[in-house]
Each structure stands twice: as structure tokens, then as C-alpha cells.
Amino acid sequence: MADTKPAAEQSGTYAIVEASGTQIWLQPNRYYDIDRLQAEVDDTIKLENVLLVKDGKGTTLGQPYVKDATVSLKVMAHRRGPKVIVYKMRPKKKTRRKNGHRQELTRVMVESISVGGKAIS
């Protein structure tokens, strides 16, 4: 039986980048929700804080960043995450406090991962 996965998934191409104060594992042609970025819908963003790149040839680990490595992201939409309820109460007292929070998110599609100006995906 033939493998029906895309070529990027078969070879295991991915990059770990630093964005919005967190480290994110990104694979080509997939979308991710990350903390809100200051960009318009359909803009292309280049992330240069690439910590690790893995392709069919091997793994490149940065110290702390991989030299000349970039990840291109396309902004698909701005959205809000699920509501998180924070409820605080003091037992045996009438003190109760309920707050809600929805995180502002940006949905991005990984267009390409490139090292040294050459796209690997």
C-alpha cells in the first residue's frame, strides 16, 4: 500500500522557532495559532529566530539561532481563543470573584522553511 502523506511529512521536515516569547514547532503547509502578531491579513511574515531545522539531510541546531535560516508565514486570520474562567472564593465567607479571559490569536500558515536562502520545503 502506498504512503499518501505529503512529501514534507514523509521526510519529517520541521523547524523550531522563537515567536511571541515561546518556542513553536512548525511544519510546512500547516496552520498554527500563535499569540497576536501586529500584521494584516494576507501579509507575509519572516521569522529569523530559528532554533532548529530538520530536513531530509539531517538536523541543524543553532547556537542559539541557525545562521541564515528563515521561516515564512502567511497571516490567515486574527481570532480569539476559547474562554478561560478564573473563579476565586474564600471558604466560609461571602467573597467570590469570577473573571473570564480570551487570548488574542493570529492564525498563520507556514509557507516555507529556508536555510542560506535556499528553500528546503
UniProtKB/Swiss-Prot annotation:
Which species expresses this protein natively?
Synechococcus sp. (strain CC9605)
What is the purpose of this protein? This protein binds to 23S rRNA in the presence of protein L20.
Q: Does the keyword RNA-binding apply?
A: yes
Entry GO MF terms: rRNA binding; structural constituent of ribosome
Record GO biological process: translation
* Assembly and oligomerization: Part of the 50S ribosomal subunit. Contacts protein L20.
Which residue windows are coiled coil? none
Which GO cellular component does the record give, naming just one? ribonucleoprotein complex
What family is reported?
Answer: Belongs to the bacterial ribosomal protein bL21 family.
Query: By its UniProt entry, which Pfam families does this protein fall under?
Result: Ribosomal_L21p (PF00829)
The entry's keywords? Ribonucleoprotein, Ribosomal protein, RNA-binding, rRNA-binding
| Signal sequence range | none
List where the protein spans the membrane.
none
Q: Does the keyword rRNA-binding apply?
A: yes
Q: What is this protein called?
A: Large ribosomal subunit protein bL21
Q: Which NCBIfam families match?
A: L21
